[in-house]
Amino acid sequence: MNLKKITKTALAGLLAAALAVGLAGCGKSGADSAKSADGKKIVTVAHTNYYVPYDYVNEQGESDGFEVAVMKEVAKKLPQYEFKFVPTSDDDLLIGVESGKYTVGTKGIWITDARKKKYVFPKNNIGASVIGLAIRKDTADKIKDLKTFAQFSGKIVPIAPQDARYMVIDEYNKENPDNQIKLTSSEAFQVADAYSWVLEGRYDGYLDVELSYKNNIAKEDAPYHQFDDKMAYVRYKGIPTYPIFNKKEQAFADDYDKAIEELRAEGKIAELEQKYFGESLSDYLK
């Protein structure tokens, strides 16, 4: 019997087995039941690293923001989990939660039908963002809301159908069949174009998230601050924002729901809204 040949065969078998185990391990998602030293399930909370005041990294290099703060309060309510916060980009968050790299993600997300196919949405929202119209200042005395905008002209900058803002105008039109906004679809364009089209009179309004308007125009260091003296913003309503969970994390989403309901009843959510926004954005959901 050739001992050398047997040894090589055995070694090859061991390597194959080790490789199979390694591949099996790689097939498991990061959201699958990792345990800490004390037996708690580790959950990774991805959040955007720039979206002040919702989700960002502060000057001390720490995860911060309203939604991050809420999730940290949720963590206190759920001692069976160990929360790890990971600041990242928009794309990595969305892809990572879908693939299981992250357990849950927060980035001021609205519900859409397309997103519901990829993620678990909890029953309870985490917060809200305000949506409204960027208009010319010379029309501000006539345009006070969507109804008066529709009466004025209804000429709104086109919106891509997959954009959650399209749904906002579509719902308004369904509720107001006799006072429609001229909703047309478009592909993506630069936000500077939208503001320019409104200023030129090509359209009379651009549906914009208030925070985006502030960051793009209202702030002194905003990239399009030169438009500030010619444009105005009209609030419409609040849109609920949600954390998104990996599809395998329904149980964790259910636990989140219980915790968030307790926090809301205790007034903690309202307290954090005042801290980060200076007002209750939840009031705009009513």
Where is each model-derived feature located?
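Ligand-binding clefts/hinges and TM-proximal coupling segments of bilobed small-molecule sensing domains
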Residues: 31, 81-84, 162-185, 258-286
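Extracytoplasmic small-molecule ligand-binding "clamshell" domains
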Residues: 34-109
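Bilobed "Venus flytrap"/periplasmic-binding protein-like clamshell domains
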Residues: 45, 49-52, 64-76, 132-191, ...
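Periplasmic-binding protein-like
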Residues: 49, 127-132, 221-257, 279-286
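Extended ligand-binding regions for polar small-molecule ligands
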Residues: 68-78, 137-140, 147, 155, ...
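Acidic, polar ligand-binding/catalytic clefts
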Residues: 84-150, 232-234
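Short helix-initiation/N-cap motifs at beta->coil->alpha
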Residues: 84-95, 183-200, 212
